[in-house]
């Protein structure tokens, strides 16, 4: 029996916090108009194509080292709530979906864990023909996987690593290896015993830092060349504290 040919067209993959997935036509989607089942909400949207792949990173008591995949072309469309991702993949016992990414086979992701290690992998490296996925990342039992970050191929791309104690380290993306077979990866940032890596970003010239300021108010600050200079170093260094924040929580690429 011949395989059903998928028409290559733009879609937006919509994923809910409780793991319901759907693919809506086009890329002109207003996320504010999306509706979900009672008690559910938006996890994220991914502008991709019907020939691309949806990756699901699972979590369990043994760490989030297993990756599952399904073809975007198999996802339901229309106006409904979609389909639970658990009907498309077979999660290992005790595991739950933790993070998602939908994109082309050639795209590269930065995968990092709270223990401070990380690696680069192409989407094609993470795809499995088995519904049970594949073991890809080596994580300690107490370590968790951070949300995967799209790594742009720009020569000047930089990596930002933010620790729980508010230290920020910035270094060239070229200092991280592409590891097609997975593993533990390289040390991204040097962490003290009680510290952890809480956020990573791949960016060009400027970086958003989000968190709480003095007095507990939500704060967001854009760091450009002058503000970033003190934090630039080599991979596996400790980085420097970020001024002006009571608790920096996230770093995000600008633009």
Where are these regions (language model features)?
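Short, structured "edge-of-domain" segments at secondary-structure transitions
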Residues: 1-255
């Amino acid at each position: 029996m011949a395989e059903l040919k998928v028409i290559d067209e733009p879609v937006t993959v919509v994923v809910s916090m409780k793991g319901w997935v759907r693919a809506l036509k086009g890329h002109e989607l207003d996320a504010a108009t999306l509706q979900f089942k009672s008690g559910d909400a938006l996890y994220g949207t991914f502008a991709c194509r019907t020939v691309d792949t949806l990756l699901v990173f699972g979590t369990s008591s043994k760490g989030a080292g297993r990756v599952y995949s399904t073809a975007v072309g198999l996802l339901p469309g229309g106006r409904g709530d979609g389909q639970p991702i658990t009907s498309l993949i077979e999660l290992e016992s005790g595991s739950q979906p933790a993070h998602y990414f939908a994109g082309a086979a050639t795209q590269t992701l930065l995968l990092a864990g709270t223990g401070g290690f990380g690696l680069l992998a192409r989407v094609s490296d993470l795809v499995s023909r088995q519904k049970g996925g594949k073991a890809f990342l080596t994580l300690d039992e107490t370590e968790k996987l951070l949300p995967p970050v799209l790594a742009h191929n720009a020569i000047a791309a930089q990596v930002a690593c933010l620790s729980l104690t508010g230290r920020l380290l910035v270094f060239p993306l070229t200092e991280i290896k592409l590891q097609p077979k997975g593993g533990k990866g390289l040390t991204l940032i040097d962490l003290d015993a009680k510290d952890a890596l809480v956020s990573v970003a791949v960016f060009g010239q400027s970086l958003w830092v989000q968190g709480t300021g003095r007095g507990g108010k939500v704060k967001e600050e854009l760091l450009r060349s002058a503000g970033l200079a003190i934090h630039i170093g080599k991979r596996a260094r400790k980085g420097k504290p970020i001024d002006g924040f009571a608790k920096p929580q996230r770093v995000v690429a600008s633009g």
